[in-house]
Amino acid sequence: MSDELRIIISGGGTGGHIFPAVSIADAIRRKRPEAKILFVGAEGRMEMQRVPAAGYEIKGLPIAGFDRKRLWRNIAVVMKIIKCRKLAAGILKDFRPQVAVGVGGYASGPTLNVAESMGVPTVLQEQNSYAGVTNKLLAKKAAKICVAYDGMERFFPADRILLTGNPVRAGLTAPKCTNEDAVKSFGLQPGKRTVLLIGGSLGARTMNESVLGNLPLIKAQTDVQFIWQTGKYYSAEINEEMSRRGKPDNLYFSDFISDMATAYAAADLVISRAGAGSISEFCLLGKPVILVPSPNVAEDHQTKNALALVQKDAAIYVPDENARRTLLPLAINTVNDNAKLQSLAENILKLAKPNAADDIADIVIALAERTK
């Protein structure tokens, strides 16, 4: 067999799975430029565009997740899984990987399950503090399990766990501009406290309604300003509302912020959902954060992610059902509290794992070398 490394990386569905996957691939390629890397994702999901844009080949499986509310619909899902296992087997036979890496998401289940049945060593990358069902099943045969939180032996064999942290998207740790320039780029005033609200690329209704319900409070702030990513799903509705009510001068809003490094550089305080990837970014940057976990995720894992930080005084937690009423007043009080900001920043920075992508790449490469 050739000396080149051949590695499959499977998963996706959301940026929280895709960014770590690409970061791992980039780290492998930096260390071993000759490595052949193939992604396996889910047809119709964002990885089918994001991965090729990052310079990697991807194969798609016609996979979908289980419907946890309407169980009768899962008959079709089971049939798709059977089909996807056959397709994954064909991909694995053609590509002949020495290692298969799973980062979570619909495609990782059948791909890694088939890889394990074919004797291909697997590496799991579990981003959350509460492991999902698929990873718990795959972990029984996984060679290595890379995690971002302490205490994951609750879910996985302790002798195969490695505390690596979560890889984050490229470019965050080397901001392209100063805080002053970053604030100016959003049309806001340097020297004022700045709150960044991000509800994900599609948006978060509760967080958006918190802003819309507190526009008079926002307008009344003379020393606090806001950068608000509304999400594409709510764009038309919010544009119409702002046209009707008038946009405060101290509020910048957009359906999507493509340059998150600049947005983070501008922010004194962040308000966000509690996805594992986002939390890893806040840790790496030492950003004070208020977390509003999404109630619409499997096993309520975002709440568990948030509480893992709250237990270490590294974040503030607001339940989704309370956000409409309490989120904006709390954010304004917090961003004006220097001692609180400093404490949050220091404590969250302690949780950072800045070398996560390189550490995981080293694990994958070492395993591949032994398998060749």
Would you name each region that the model predicts?
Residues 45-46, 50, 54, 177-184, ...:
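Donor-nucleotide binding loops and adjacent catalytic segments primarily
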Residues 87-101, 107-123, 136-141:
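Glycosyltransferases and closely related glycan-assembly transferases
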Residues 340-354:
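A short, well-ordered alpha-helix in the C-terminal region of glycosyltransferases
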Residues 118, 265-267, 281-292, 312:
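Conserved donor-binding/catalytic loop of nucleotide-activated donor transferases
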Residues 4-12, 34-79, 85, 232-234, ...:
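Conserved nucleotide-sugar phosphate-binding/catalytic loop shared by glycosyltransferases and other
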Residues 97-99, 265-279, 287:
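Acidic donor-binding loop of glycosyltransferase active sites
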Residues 353-372:
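C-terminal alpha-helical cap of glycosyltransferases
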Residues 57, 116-180, 188:
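Active-site-proximal region of nucleotide-activated glycan assembly enzymes
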